[in-house]
Amino acid sequence: MLRYALIFFVIAIIAAVFGFGGIAAGAAEIAKILFYIFVVIFLVTLLLGVVRR
């Protein structure tokens, strides 16, 4: 479960680079939304991984 949390964290960082880097307006908005979604998924999987141990 912790592995999935790290994967979602990396995806969130990549989305942040694209979203906050100023590539294009449309892509930036999508990347910002994806960033927040994957951060939430990262936190949920991190908590589930800690609780199950």
From Swiss-Prot:
InterPro entries: DUF1328 (IPR009760). One of its GO terms (cellular component) is plasma membrane. It is a multi-pass membrane protein. The keyword Zinc-finger does not apply. Keywords: Cell membrane, Membrane, Transmembrane, Transmembrane helix. The chain crosses the membrane at residues 5-25, 30-50. It is found in: Cell membrane. Pfam families: DUF1328. Belongs to the UPF0391 family. HAMAP family: UPF0391. This is UPF0391 membrane protein Bmul_5473/BMULJ_06024. It comes from Burkholderia multivorans (strain ATCC 17616 / 249).
